[in-house]
């Protein structure tokens, strides 16, 4: 069932020769047939003048239904005639590629309609009332992304060569057709704020462009798009899962089964209906992270920016809570600036709110210092670290949208009624209100006294830890001297004789009297050293006897042992 759109067994040379050999008389008729009525899904059926920047791209429907399609279009690029009626049971062939005749087909229709249709401005939407949600969906599918998606390298190079061949298309009209695409899409993206109603918004995370054609229920008569909404907000956490939005590779892969596609289409449409936002819609930079939104290099931006955030919040979002998801583009950049400017020059009633944001930033920096390895310990009672550490820890674990949500509510004073993630937006403001007037006006002056006290405290603690080590080391260096001083403390002469010129500090030196002489020494020196050793022993024995006598001990017993 799915093998036919992805069959690579066709011959590129035969296909190219068939395309080149088409005569000029039937070129305009055959080119239009390569696009069945599926192409009208993505563009509104209104007029197009020579001013291409202000109009929508048009494909005439009369030619598409009258001329029979050639054989190569039926094989690969086209649907059978009864395919639009059974769109839910067959894969869309339009999702795979766009033949280069599409550009020349648009070129021909541009030339034909520019001479007949009057100019018409785009100040008001011109789609019929039955199709309110078709334009936001079509903004996600660019012609470049459709042309680039799921094409083998050989076929892509062949189409590139065909599209720029001078024998097939006229250069000036081809360039005008390309400019019509780009300017029409740019102008349509600029007017998104005015063309959509309040309930007609982008979903919270736009899907890749290859899934969008599979997930829309488009009627076969090309007159209206009927999208059914369930309106049940409790099913959103079952509907919105990131398995729908898997990044598409650049090579052809088999499509999933039609039952899964129909379920995913219902889930995605239910989610986009129930999670409408009231703030201004995102700009073109938010919708298209790169010029080719379905390239595999840019698919990571969908997952990192849009698909990473919904897991942190509960799905039952109210209309006023969703300002954190799509904040206005002009309000994102200067959010950091008013916190310091308004703290310096602002009336007193506004100071608590601005200071809470300032203290929240300060708490984040303090917690980063504590967690970063410096280990500067501060007194919890002096700074209320129980409040600031909890708030900073929860803010670091939250997504960046949580901080933007908090800053949004801080500056705009929006009364919020959070259902599930109350602590995500109010974890800093109620706890820090008592200290709102305490810090000074400059942020560094506010941070310096407490950090200075903490650093001074840590320095004194380190100094106290180092001093016992120095005392112990000095005592270890001077261990033999007190022992010798005790031994010779009986007489002052003995204390003087302790200082010897040669000292060999080993384990048992305190118990030895060094009397040896070097082998090269003279006999007189050896005799003198022996005499000094005898005198030293005598003085030591006398000092010991005097100490025992002063203590009241038995001197006779000691003399009997010593002598």
Curated annotation (Swiss-Prot):
Upregulating conditions: Expression is controlled by abaA.
Low complexity composition bias: residue spans: 272-305
GO biological process: conidium formation; sporulation resulting in formation of a cellular spore
KW Transcription regulation (keyword) present: yes
Keyword Lipid biosynthesis: no
Key words of the record: Activator, Conidiation, Sporulation, Transcription, Transcription regulation
Loss of function: phenotype: Loses conidial pigments and exhibits autolytic phenotype.
Polar residues composition-biased segments: 54-69, 160-175, 430-441
Region annotated Disordered, chain positions: 54-81, 112-176, 272-318, 334-356, 430-494, 516-538
Role summary: BrlA, abaA and wetA are pivotal regulators of conidiophore development and conidium maturation. They act individually and together to regulate their own expression and that of numerous other sporulation-specific genes.
Family (UniProt): Belongs to the wetA family.
Protein name: Developmental regulatory protein wetA
Organism encoding this protein: Aspergillus oryzae (strain ATCC 42149 / RIB 40) (Yellow koji mold)
